[in-house]
Amino acid sequence: MPAFDYNRVFLIVMDSVGIGEAPDAEKFNDKGADTLGHIAEHMGGISLPNMAKLGLSNIREIKGVEKAEKPLAYYGKMKEASNGKDTMTGHWEIMGLYIDKPFRVFPEGFPDELIHELEQKSGRKVIGNKPASGTAILDELGAEHMETGALIVYTSADSVLQIAAHEEVVPLEELYKICEIARELTLDEKYMVGRVIARPFVGKPGEFKRTPNRHDYALKPFDRTVMNELKDDSFDVIAIGKISDIYDGEGITESLRTKSNMDGMDKLVQTLDKGFTGISFVNLVDFDALFGHRRDPEGYGKALEEFDARLPEVFEKMREDDLLIITADHGNDPVHHGTDHTREYVPLLVYSKKHEKPGALPLADTFADIGATIADNFKTNMPKYGKSFLSLLK
């Protein structure tokens, strides 16, 4: 193996932790969005002592977070180049892609035209058609579905179309076929849904239970990512949390499921104890799913403080030749209008024990700078997009 500047790279994506409106925020109806800033203000100041030491407030002032006189990390912010503000777009861009057609979300449910087509092609009526929790919608509509055979269609805050059906009412094979039809229909640019999910369930009203026969119809990244290059060159690509789903398993050598942010940090810490060469990549989704979309600044702030408190464990276990990168994939300002993501800059903190004089990094024009830096470090094929900042880390 050739010698690398860093043998292991740990990449943490704090899902939706934006750091202020992007220059093109207005185009996305997100003027004034500021996830971190507004949370800190709402709390009368937020306590993030470990990210403070790394240089979080050196990127820009965050209320309650002290500016570091001698930051321990390189710090900066990144602008999203792609034309979207969803999780898949953000993550795919981090790994070297540029997405010009955004995935769509449907906070009001899916357009009548799409539902009508689905009804015609499946031969079944559709009920629901709104954002909902998968268990709550079964309680609400499960009995009606059993009586009528209508499909329960629902979405979430992500770009997803889910179809729930009782296994004794709609046989699995039929449900899977209907989901394939839905997948086909939603590739149309008007709808562009990231993922279609079959959600079979069993049981009686009041006791419905989802079964393990769930099936996902996702999209593979539209081009090769840095993860594909790493895997093909025999490096380890350990995916923690939602990462494997986001890239539809592409370029991944090991996948660890998680139940929460804290579980995600536990799994990341486990990988710090492993001997491997390559990357360990975690997505902490609770910020987004539990607090951003629900517009709960208090809960969001507490979750950030809990995450920050886990960092000393990470620092302690890091080896001299490890690199830690902390960033985000988009914003989700919990005091902004609506319930959708927000178009923002994302923070970039880059830490290693061997850095002698960390400081500011230039503004990144694309999240792909991270992918380019990782590719540069492991001497694999470079992505088409992104500029490596490896040579700036000293």
Swiss-Prot record:
Record keywords: Cytoplasm, Isomerase, Manganese, Metal-binding
GO biological process, one term: metabolic compound salvage
Binding site for Mn(2+) 1: 15, 329-330
Full protein name: Phosphopentomutase
Entries under PANTHER family matching the protein: PHOSPHOPENTOMUTASE
Cofactor remark: Binds 2 manganese ions.
Superkingdom of this protein's organism: Bacteria
Family label: Belongs to the phosphopentomutase family.
Catalytic activity: 2-deoxy-alpha-D-ribose 1-phosphate = 2-deoxy-D-ribose 5-phosphate; alpha-D-ribose 1-phosphate = D-ribose 5-phosphate
Annotated CDD domains: PPM (cd16009)
InterPro entries to which the protein is assigned, alphabetical: Alkaline_phosphatase_core_sf, DeoB, Metalloenzyme, Phosphopentomutase_DeoB_cap_sf
NCBIfam families (alphabetical): deoB, PRK05362.1
Source organism of the structure: Bacillus licheniformis (strain ATCC 14580 / DSM 13 / JCM 2505 / CCUG 7422 / NBRC 12200 / NCIMB 9375 / NCTC 10341 / NRRL NRS-1264 / Gibson 46)
Pfam families: Metalloenzyme
Subcellular location: Cytoplasm
Cofactor(s) listed in the protein's UniProt record: Mn(2+)
E.C. numbers: 5.4.2.7
Binding residue positions for Mn(2+) 2: 288, 293, 341
Pathway: Carbohydrate degradation; 2-deoxy-D-ribose 1-phosphate degradation; D-glyceraldehyde 3-phosphate and acetaldehyde from 2-deoxy-alpha-D-ribose 1-phosphate: step 1/2
GO cellular component: cytosol
Gene Ontology MF term list: magnesium ion binding; manganese ion binding; phosphopentomutase activity
Function, as annotated: Isomerase that catalyzes the conversion of deoxy-ribose 1-phosphate (dRib-1-P) and ribose 1-phosphate (Rib-1-P) to deoxy-ribose 5-phosphate (dRib-5-P) and ribose 5-phosphate (Rib-5-P), respectively.
